[in-house]
Amino acid sequence: MISYLKGNPIETLKNTQNRILLILEVNQVGYEMQIPSRFARELSQNPRETLQVFTHLQVKDEQPILYGFATAAERELFRQLVSVSGIGAQLAIALIDTLGLEELVQAIVNGNIRTLSQTPGVGQKTAERIALELKTKLSQWRKLVGITLPSTSAIPSLEVLEDVEMTLLALGYTNEEINKAISTLSQDNQMLKNTNSEEWIREAIAWLSQ
């Protein structure tokens, strides 16, 4: 089993199935692997001559497929996700791409079905199954890898969250932008005490418009 590969990133590209591939040259051998789009964006923004990629090898229809991740924790989360019935590699990568490591773990541990369902291809039943099967495992695992979750008092109520997310998504903001706005506003104790969804939406739009 290959734990990681360290070498020179040659290029990233999309294949005919719109999946992002990284070509990593190690000792004059080019390894092709699928990586999350988040990882690809990071590489384009911060180019480097030498790169360490944590890998997972999967054999499908007798064909080996290599997946690459920026961190060992991200790879382990991927492995946990594909262990869930009905969750394949592409859906696992989509979850990581949509929410990112910490937010995805937080959503699973807190049983936040709505957040999990933001991922294309993940419906309510699938989200519920992910939370049900992984909640206990990830509650223990995230402590080992140093992922800290905010206390429930450090986030607005679920009803407010849903209203803010639905409104901002309808206005064209991305999940990433919405989550950043909510996270920033949640640092204000006065806002946390506020249960008025309209005020949360107004403040979020103001922050996003800066």
Curated annotation (Swiss-Prot):
Domain characteristics, as noted in the entry: Has three domains with a flexible linker between the domains II and III and assumes an 'L' shape. Domain III is highly mobile and contacts RuvB.
Quaternary data: Homotetramer. Forms an RuvA(8)-RuvB(12)-Holliday junction (HJ) complex. HJ DNA is sandwiched between 2 RuvA tetramers; dsDNA enters through RuvA and exits via RuvB. An RuvB hexamer assembles on each DNA strand where it exits the tetramer. Each RuvB hexamer is contacted by two RuvA subunits (via domain III) on 2 adjacent RuvB subunits; this complex drives branch migration. In the full resolvosome a probable DNA-RuvA(4)-RuvB(12)-RuvC(2) complex forms which resolves the HJ.
The UniProt keywords, alphabetically, are: Cytoplasm, DNA damage, DNA recombination, DNA repair, DNA-binding
Pfam families listed in its UniProt record: HHH_5, RuvA_C, RuvA_N
Q: Where is this region: Flexible linker?
A: 150-160
Region of interest: Domain II: 71-149
The principal localisation class reads cytoplasm
Summarizing the function annotation, the protein's role is: The RuvA-RuvB-RuvC complex processes Holliday junction (HJ) DNA during genetic recombination and DNA repair, while the RuvA-RuvB complex plays an important role in the rescue of blocked DNA replication forks via replication fork reversal (RFR). RuvA specifically binds to HJ cruciform DNA, conferring on it an open structure. The RuvB hexamer acts as an ATP-dependent pump, pulling dsDNA into and through the RuvAB complex. HJ branch migration allows RuvC to scan DNA until it finds its consensus sequence, where it cleaves and resolves the cruciform DNA.
**Residue segments, region Domain III:** 160-210
Q: Provide the protein name.
A: Holliday junction branch migration complex subunit RuvA
Localized where? Cytoplasm
- Biological process, per Gene Ontology: DNA recombination; DNA repair
What are the boundaries of the region Domain I? 1-70
Gene Ontology terms for molecular function: ATP binding; four-way junction DNA binding; four-way junction helicase activity
InterPro entries, per database record = DNA_helicase_Holl-junc_RuvA_I (IPR013849), Hlx-hairpin-Hlx_DNA-bd_motif (IPR003583), NA-bd_OB-fold (IPR012340), RuvA (IPR000085), RuvA_2-like (IPR010994), RuvA_C (IPR011114), RuvA_C_sf (IPR036267)
GO CC term, one of those recorded: cytoplasm
